[in-house]
Amino acid sequence: MPSQFRTIALIGKPDAPRIADTLAAIHSYLLTSGLEILVEHGCAGLFPRSARTGTMPELARQADIAVVVGGDGTLLGAARSLYAHGVPLVGINLGRLGFLVDISPNEAVDKLHAILSGACRAEERYPLAARLLRNGQTIAQGSAINEVVVHSGSATSMIELETAIDGVFLNSQRSDGLIVSTPTGSTAYALSAGGPILYPTLNATVLAPINPHTLSNRPIVISGDSLVTIAFRPNKEFRAQVSCDNVPFPDVGIEDRIEIRKAERPFRILHPTDYDFFQILRHKLNWSNR
């Protein structure tokens, strides 16, 4: 089969329902098509011993495309490992309809055949790049496909923050924390904090306070090209945590500063040509149909 994709990575959630049958069907199709297959170590037990396996770093270096079988979390985990190498992803959904994994197991082979033949919609989504600064020096950094969260780390105490956008003061707040979200993350934690849903390819960032003390402190959408700077206000009982997609920065101090901006490169998701984000929203959120 003529294709720009010659080496296909297979990544799956080993304990997901229907995972074995779905991966077996995809594996058989790829073998018949004469394509190279590289199976991620975590699901290697679901394949014949002769299958070629590799770690995520090896997949990132060698694969032309990754087929991810599972849910949104499985795809996001793969994206974090692969996006720096420019490996596009295709999501096969097991279980409930996902925002990111949109191909059903019953259609997996047909849809995958079309995508590998070039009949697809490519979608670029930018993560966030965050760094923790102390005395002007970077002491920790990370990336977030969904969100960067600054919070007190305690269910019983609030945190006091000052936020600036491109060096211009935005506001100060007392709250349980602040979510800085990508469009991808706008349907995740930020949504539960009252944030808006952003179209996935929109060049924008959401700032959503978590349970603000001042009720007029509402979520705000800013340019995706803006630099968000967060500082802590003096507090005798200071404690804070900063996390990128639930991966925490260590030892956050009261004089530290957090800088968050759009990452330099996107990750790519390949969808079937009939992909419809609004249909997914209607289904997931139980919106009315016509």
Curated annotation (Swiss-Prot):
InterPro entries per the UniProt record, alphabetical: ATP-NAD_kinase_N, ATP-NAD_kinase_PpnK-typ_C, NAD/diacylglycerol_kinase_sf, NADK
Keywords linked to the UniProt accession: ATP-binding, Cytoplasm, Kinase, NAD, NADP, Nucleotide-binding, Transferase
One GO CC term, this protein: cytoplasm
Catalytic activity: NAD(+) + ATP = ADP + NADP(+) + H(+)
Protein's cellular compartments: Cytoplasm
GO biological process: NAD metabolic process; NADP biosynthetic process
Top-level EC class as recorded in UniProt: transferase
The EC number(s) this enzyme carries: 2.7.1.23
Catalytic residues identified in the record: D72 (proton acceptor)
Binding sites annotated in the UniProt record for NAD(+): D72, G73, N146, E147, R174, D176, T187, A188, Y189, A190, L191, S192
Gene3D superfamilies named among the record's database cross-references: Probable inorganic polyphosphate/atp-NAD kinase, domain 1 (3.40.50.10330), Probable inorganic polyphosphate/atp-NAD kinase, domain 2 (2.60.200.30)
Main location: cytoplasm
Top-rank lineage group of the source organism: Bacteria
Pfam families: NAD_kinase (PF01513), NAD_kinase_C (PF20143)
One of the record's GO molecular function terms: NAD+ kinase activity
Cofactor (UniProt): a divalent metal cation
The protein's role, per its UniProt record: Involved in the regulation of the intracellular balance of NAD and NADP, and is a key enzyme in the biosynthesis of NADP. Catalyzes specifically the phosphorylation on 2'-hydroxyl of the adenosine moiety of NAD to yield NADP.
Family stated for the protein in its record: Belongs to the NAD kinase family.
Protein name stated in the entry: NAD kinase
Record organism: Methylococcus capsulatus (strain ATCC 33009 / NCIMB 11132 / Bath)
Organism lineage: Bacteria, Pseudomonadati, Pseudomonadota, Gammaproteobacteria, Methylococcales
